[in-house]
């Protein structure tokens, strides 16, 4: 007991002495030197925390948006040698039985060419104003529950179930938002809400009104022409209900890995690929994230070394220029 009291008294005394010496040093110190040291330490701290956070956060933000709006926690897609998910209705029924299932959306996909001046006569050798685009077929109600895509419509309005003659178009397909003119890369000019465009898939073409323009920062929407799923099936000559992707959202009661294992055990792996969001992220995105992490650590390390040297020089110069020294 006596030893404990002695330790506590010694600790209290040390704190009091340290506090007294600190106040005394601050009173006698050069205010500019102290300010410089505090500033360097603050900037060093910000460099360690903020720079790494910004570099990694840029990619993390893209991944989070991709996961939230495009692929969910689990994504089911066609095998690489197939064009669609086989037995899609059966797969959807299995998806709804996942413990922790919250929501899903079924999307039909394809590649299309969109033209805006198809009614005009062009001179020999000229190209029509057109662009290649991904074709995305959705159920408007189902997709809205999943991704809330209507909030990304920056002009015009969202699709409803009766809009068989209307489409949404991603901003990256429009010259107004992507003013790039390069060989092999075309965007649509003079296209706005209410314009008529022609969408062509192979030998099948149809005219549509542009009902809205999408800006989501997710390529799934920004580089796509979005139409009703029935229209995409018609354009791609698909006579069944086999879809391109099924994105699934889960609640917190189950992990994506557990949900993936459940789907594979239920036989979904026979019809399509089953991936977690982490598996589905493009490799280049993972490589960029890792590179930015290394770059952030290197910058922070260099900043720490420079700050340490700077503070040492400031303190050393301040010490040797003092008039009075204690114990010297």
Regions found by a protein language model. Give the residues of each.
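N-terminal Sec/SRP start-transfer signal
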Residues: 1-49
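Short amphipathic alpha-helical coupling elements at transmembrane boundaries
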Residues: 20, 24, 28, 60, ...
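Basic-flanked hydrophobic alpha-helices used for secretion and membrane insertion
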Residues: 154-157, 168-275
């Amino acid at each position: 007991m006596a030893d404990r009291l002695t330790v506590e008294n010694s600790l209290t005394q040390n704190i009091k002495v340290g506090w007294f010496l600190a106040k005394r040093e601050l009173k006698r110190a050069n205010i500019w030197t102290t300010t410089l040291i505090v500033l360097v330490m603050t900037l060093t701290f910000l460099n360690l925390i903020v720079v790494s956070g910004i570099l990694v956060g840029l990619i993390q933000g893209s991944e989070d948006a991709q996961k939230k709006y495009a692929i969910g926690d689990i994504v089911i897609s066609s095998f690489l040698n197939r064009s669609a998910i086989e037995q899609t209705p059966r797969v959807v029924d299995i998806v709804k039985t996942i413990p922790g299932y919250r929501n899903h959306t079924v999307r039909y996909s394809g590649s299309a060419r969109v033209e805006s001046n198809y009614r005009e006569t062009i001179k020999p050798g000229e190209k029509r104003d057109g662009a290649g685009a991904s074709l995305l077929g959705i159920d408007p109600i189902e997709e809205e529950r999943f991704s809330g895509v209507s909030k990304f419509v920056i002009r015009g309005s969202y699709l409803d179930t009766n809009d068989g003659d209307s489409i949404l178009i991603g901003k990256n397909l429009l010259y107004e938002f992507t003013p790039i003119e390069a060989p092999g890369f075309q965007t649509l000019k003079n296209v706005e809400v209410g314009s008529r465009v022609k969408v062509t898939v192979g030998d099948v073409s149809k005219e549509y009104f542009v009902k809205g323009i999408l800006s989501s920062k997710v390529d799934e929407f920004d580089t796509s022409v979005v139409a009703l799923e029935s229209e995409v099936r018609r354009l791609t000559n698909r006579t069944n209900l086999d879809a391109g992707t099924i994105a699934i959202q889960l609640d917190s009661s189950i992990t994506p890995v557990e949900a993936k294992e459940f789907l594979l055990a239920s036989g979904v792996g026979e019809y399509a690929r089953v991936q977690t969001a982490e598996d589905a992220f493009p490799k280049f995105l993972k490589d960029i994230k890792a590179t930015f992490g290394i770059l952030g650590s290197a910058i922070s390390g260099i900043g720490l070394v420079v700050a340490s040297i700077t503070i040492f020089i400031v303190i050393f110069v301040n010490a040797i220029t003092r008039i009075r020294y204690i114990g010297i």
